């Protein structure tokens, strides 16, 4: 009797297994690892999903099928598959998966980064491209960038005179914040009443958006889990703080006469109908949603990218020496460094590209959602499937890059590969309809800051530290900054 029982149980589970695999074969889904009941493949993502997904792609191929809780997902990890997602089928793959807390933080998806693809999204995207991110607009904020970088240099100079250690993670993010607040709100952040509030807003928002939200993967019980873990309450607290911060910024702008040529001024014109948005009414919450995108994208990406560049330079003395020699030869003895000076610095541009390759700030793009059934790489991708684009995997792929773990700026010497979304081997800012629109603004600050740091100062490690002690591990969240802060001592030179 017991033998028959064992046989019946075996046949039952074997039938389920065969049925599931038959259904998967008929659906022609991409290959993927076995999954557990309820949680699916969530346990395989770990604390750094971009690295875990890269390993899975090495085993299962350029397209990997995962079930993340209740969510069917696909990971694209090669230039060919990513090109299909971001270019060939961009229109069908560029909507957004609904994410609970990004939706709340962004005023119910009234921003651009997290909003689904729709007529509204297209209208606002067009407005921002035409009004906010043109070359003329980027150039109009040049004086602000140059003034803030000059102030930053004075701070570094003071630290150098005292032989003090400088925490570059902290100071560079603060520099980015100062620029963004002047460009966005017309506010000098340092010494203002909003300085502390601003830091709380940035840190709190990044923490919430970078947290694992159970409600995104488990429709009913997930919300309960988020309340138990405290994420729900944390999000509400952060949202109220962010909303209050934007209210104060807009109030400050209006009380100041509202005549400054900043981004708030532009968005208020859209609110008043002075700049058309077609059939859509642009409210104060829409203004705040767009400001949130600008604040988050501008502050962390520029500051942390410069930190990664300096990290690789201090780890590679040969590259540091070559970059400084170029900068000092081109700049010579100029008192005032301007953004025009970047034009002749070809090696520095290669250093920045190589940093963006090894340490893209967003290694795993915000998940997209297929708006209809599509076929990619010979596999069926059903409607509503989440699509994860693993930039990290492309940038570390030995079939794409020779010695991908090595920092070699010279690899860009004999090719025209750029980071503007047209070369699918290098996509630090994404591509297609969802490409980061503020590339020009961010790169202008990155290059200007680096020219000053390399021209005016030499750099050394704190006493007792060796080059081998400099850590290259990244943290994971909405962006991936250097986990251990980079602390260096600036040294005065004849160019200081």
From Swiss-Prot:
TM segment ranges: 1-21
Record's GO cellular component terms: membrane; plastid
Classification via Gene3D superfamilies: Cytochrome P450
Organism: Arabidopsis thaliana (Mouse-ear cress)
SUPFAM superfamilies (alphabetical): Cytochrome P450 (SSF48264)
Bilayer topology: Single-pass membrane protein
The enzyme's E.C. designation: 1.14.-.-
Family, as annotated: Belongs to the cytochrome P450 family.
Taxonomic superkingdom: Eukaryota
Protein name (Swiss-Prot/TrEMBL): Cytochrome P450 71B13
One Gene Ontology molecular-function label: heme binding
Cofactor(s) listed in the protein's UniProt record: heme
Signal peptide start and end residues: none
Alphabetical list of InterPro entries matching this protein: Cyt_P450, Cyt_P450_CS, Cyt_P450_E_grp-I, Cyt_P450_sf
Intracellular or extracellular location(s): Membrane
First-level EC class: oxidoreductase
Keywords recorded for this protein, A-Z: Heme, Iron, Membrane, Metal-binding, Monooxygenase, Oxidoreductase, Transmembrane, Transmembrane helix
Binding sites annotated in the UniProt record for heme: 436
Pfam families: p450
